[in-house]
């Protein structure tokens, strides 16, 4: 017969406290507005930091000079950040349904050498912020995300949320991560 051993379980518990700042500004990419550069420099690590910007392409119709402004901002603040690329993506739920787009973003993050000390800036509505957040959270053990919501709904939902999700297998928000933003800029 097998002798039954009785023992008390070892129970482990941990808590993770995390905070991030939400800043309100205008003309985020104006060269004289140092907010974005200040937020990146505040991590206390030596710079410049690699930064990829992923932007809802619907914004470009209303702000045709935005990509040029982002490039100029990167040049003006090159002591703090190195702009590796700006990637326009289609907005809305279509971006969260496209596994190929997410894989392409992750491949781009790898190709430009982003790591967990780098930043991805997501600019757009809630669906784009969710998709970009998911791609960043699942690449290289998590790449820091700065969210820039451009709709009222995104400001109140994904712009300040803790989850990043994509749609898969015909189900909305099936794949999800819990990963807080490094910062929110609104």
Regions flagged by a language model, labelled:
Residues 2-118:
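ATP/NTP phosphate-donor binding region
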Residues 6-7, 130, 174:
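Short leucine-rich amphipathic alpha-helices used at interfaces
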Residues 23, 30, 137-186:
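A glycine/threonine-rich phosphate-anchoring loop and its flanking beta-alpha core
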Residues 41-42, 110-111, 135-136, 173-175:
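Short, flexible, glycine/charge-rich loop motifs used to bind or transfer phosphoryl groups or to couple energy/partner
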Residues 52-54, 85-87, 121, 146-148, ...:
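Hydrophobic/aromatic beta-strand patches that form the interior of the parallel beta-sheet core
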Residues 59, 128, 153:
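Surface-exposed, flexible loop/turn segments at secondary-structure boundaries
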Residues 63-65, 131-133, 157:
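Short glycine-/acidic-enriched loop or helix-start segments at secondary-structure transitions
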Residues 112-150:
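A short, small-residue-rich loop immediately preceding and capping a beta-strand
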């Amino acid at each position: 017969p097998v002798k039954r051993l009785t023992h008390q379980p070892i129970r482990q518990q941990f808590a993770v406290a995390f905070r991030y700042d939400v800043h309100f500004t205008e003309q985020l990419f104006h060269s004289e507005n140092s907010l974005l550069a200040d937020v990146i420099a505040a991590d206390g690590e030596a710079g410049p930091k690699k930064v990829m910007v992923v932007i809802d392409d619907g914004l470009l119709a209303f702000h045709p000079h935005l990509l040029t402004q982002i490039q100029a901002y990167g040049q003006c603040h090159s002591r703090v950040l190195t702009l590796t690329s700006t990637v326009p993506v289609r907005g809305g739920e279509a971006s969260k349904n496209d596994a190929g787009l997410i894989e392409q973003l992750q491949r781009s993050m790898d190709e430009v050498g982003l790591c967990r000390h780098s930043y991805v800036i997501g600019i757009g509505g809630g669906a784009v912020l969710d998709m970009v957040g998911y791609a960043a959270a699942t690449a290289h053990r998590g790449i820091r995300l700065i969210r820039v919501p451009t709709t009222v709904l995104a400001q109140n939902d994904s712009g300040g949320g803790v989850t990043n999700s994509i749609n898969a297998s015909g189900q909305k928000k099936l794949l999800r991560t819990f990963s807080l933003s490094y910062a929110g800029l609104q």
